Amino acid sequence: MIDCGRKFIPMSYLQDLVKIMAYYKMNTLQVHLNDNGFKQYFDNNWDKTYAAFRLESETYPGLTARDGSYSKKEFIDFQKQAATNFVEIIPEIDIPAHSLAFTHYKPEIGSKEYGMDHLDLFKPETYQFADNLFKEYLKGDDPVFVGKRVHIGTDEYSNAKKEVVEKFRAFTDHYIRLVEGFGKQAVIWGALTHAKGDTPVKSENIIMNAWYNGYADPATMIKDGYQLISIPDAMVYIVPLAGYYQDYLNEVFLYKEWTPAHIGKAVFEEKHPAILGGMFAIWNDHAGNGMSVKDIHHRVFPALQTLAVKTWTGKETSLPFEVYNEKRSAISEAPGVNQLGRIGKSPALVYERSTVAPGSTSTYPEIGYNYTVSFDITGAPEKSGTELFRSPNAVFYLADPIRGMMGFARDGYLNTFPYKVNPGEKATIQIEGDHRSTTLRVNGKVVEEMNIQKCYFNAGKDSMSYIRTLVFPLEKAGNFNSRIENLKVHNYRVSK
């Protein structure tokens, strides 16, 4: 499952991810289409809190996020192309919590009691809005939601009062039946232990993400007739830099100990007929924390490799982890896919040019972690926004657009070093990057090592980790005036 709500994930990456999944025989990708940040990072103001819905909507013009979205056509094409690779896309519209994108658009359907990220379950307008939204993507001979399953959310709504619990259960049942009315199988997040009540919720032929046993006790859910996807949060949730979940999955533990039959502390027989399989998730909880799609992939890819082994083999792994870990390093992401930006398999100087002419192109689009890029520069007057190199994913500036300093931009984030080359000045520049930092050296001295930065909110009560990494762009040189010589690219950090 990939959270595209809190951070926009470009379609090009989703397409590559499907290719990787197919290569490793993973068959289901749940695409989480809406979500929101946490209001404590936005002045404790719901109106300022980041929220997004990523799909084009003609029913509700203006609902779709302006900082990245998918047209109906490209989402349809994506699902159909994935199906040719035997990967099913399960689109998710998450209601009635995690719904700030919808209440930003239509504030009157937000809950004043439980927060504006909750829909008000007691207002008829809420149902009218959500009914029409789902119908937009379900109706017609060629619906936007192509596959046989649709996820309706139902995650983490308040259970503060019995009457709201019963309303939540009725709401869940309503949207199960709505998507079924269009011939789809409904998928829900496990919440019915947390929302324990009397109102019946359909269980026959319903799939439930079993993520936390306090929200949905898996033994009870199986007894009630639900089919489960094993996705235990403490084991298989990636929440980058958050601190309360894993930043990278504990693959040694997963490889040696976990199977889909392990849902939290509950252990079932292997290949239990009610457990359809396993899944892992990447949640982008901390909207605005500097994460790039490349950083997300750096976490996703090794997890995908290991979960592919475990979901297919269970306990019957054929190699010790140490042997598996060594051998997988030689395997590509997928034919024609290099999201990690790997160049070469052994530590080496992998690319060099005696001079870099403005506008020239490179053999490689980019180099990923770990790397060192160095060059000699003779400075000349440069306009703000002058690029050294760019790729489809990033830009490295000789003079950034704001302050005219050396720096880089990717995924909507601009990071600048406290340095610029003055006209007539000669210097040797070295940039090193790994999955946690980007370092600039000038003439052998560190100017700045951009490590993970702690940002504080609400008088220090709340904090967020901010990352400043860069998969270095190499594809095309900018239109600079300075002279660039002796470009060298190493696929390791030469200072380490």
Tell me the role of every PLM-derived stretch.
Residues 5, 34-38, 94-98, 155-157, ...:
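Active-site beta-loop-alpha junctions enriched in small/polar residues
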Residues 10, 38-41, 98-101, 160-162, ...:
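Extracytoplasmic/secreted cell-surface and envelope-processing proteins
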Residues 20, 199-206, 213-354:
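Flexible, acidic glycine-rich loops studded with aromatic residues
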Residues 343-496:
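Extracellular glycan-associated modules
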